[in-house]
From Swiss-Prot:
InterPro entries: Rbsml_uS13_C (IPR027437), Ribosomal_uS13 (IPR001892), Ribosomal_uS13-like_H2TH (IPR010979), Ribosomal_uS13_bac-type (IPR019980), Ribosomal_uS13_CS (IPR018269). GO terms for molecular function: rRNA binding; structural constituent of ribosome; tRNA binding. Keywords: Ribonucleoprotein, Ribosomal protein, RNA-binding, rRNA-binding, tRNA-binding. Belongs to the universal ribosomal protein uS13 family. Disulfide bonds: none annotated. One of its GO terms (biological process) is translation. Located at the top of the head of the 30S subunit, it contacts several helices of the 16S rRNA. In the 70S ribosome it contacts the 23S rRNA (bridge B1a) and protein L5 of the 50S subunit (bridge B1b), connecting the 2 subunits; these bridges are implicated in subunit movement. Contacts the tRNAs in the A and P-sites. The gene is rpsM. This is Small ribosomal subunit protein uS13.
């Protein structure tokens, strides 16, 4: 297994699909990385040479991925909550942020129903 950005990449998958296993890299960015490093998208990871894997590592290192990206996202959410803006308040209350209805739906965000006290 090749190790890129601290993640073990599966050998049996195609390069584009294997790169999407890294948090912060989707299909589009994986294709762009393959094009920039001139690695075939349909080549499997086990077929790549060590030099090609090194170029993939360097290309992925240019992006914010994995732990740094997770930390950045959580800090952005924390900043919104500290500001006390509408989105921050919705995060704090675990409600939908983008105008969805909450009278009947939003069970995923709100959690399980609480029993009604009589």
């Amino acid at each position: 297994m090749a190790r890129i950005a601290g993640i073990n990449i599966p050998d049996h998958k195609h390069t584009v699909i294997a790169l999407t296993g890294i948090f912060g890299i989707g299909r589009t960015r994986a294709r762009a990385i393959c094009a920039a490093t001139s690695v075939a998208e349909d080549a499997k990871i086990k077929e790549l040479s060590e030099a090609q894997i090194d170029t993939l590592r360097e290309a992925v290192a240019e992006y914010t991925v994995e732990g740094d990206l997770r930390r950045e996202v959580s800090m952005n959410i924390k900043r919104l909550m500290d500001l006390g803006c509408y989105r921050g308040i919705r995060h704090r209350r675990s409600l939908p942020l983008r105008g969805q209805r909450t009278k009947t739906n939003a069970r995923t965000r709100k959690g399980p129903r609480k029993p009604i006290r009589k």
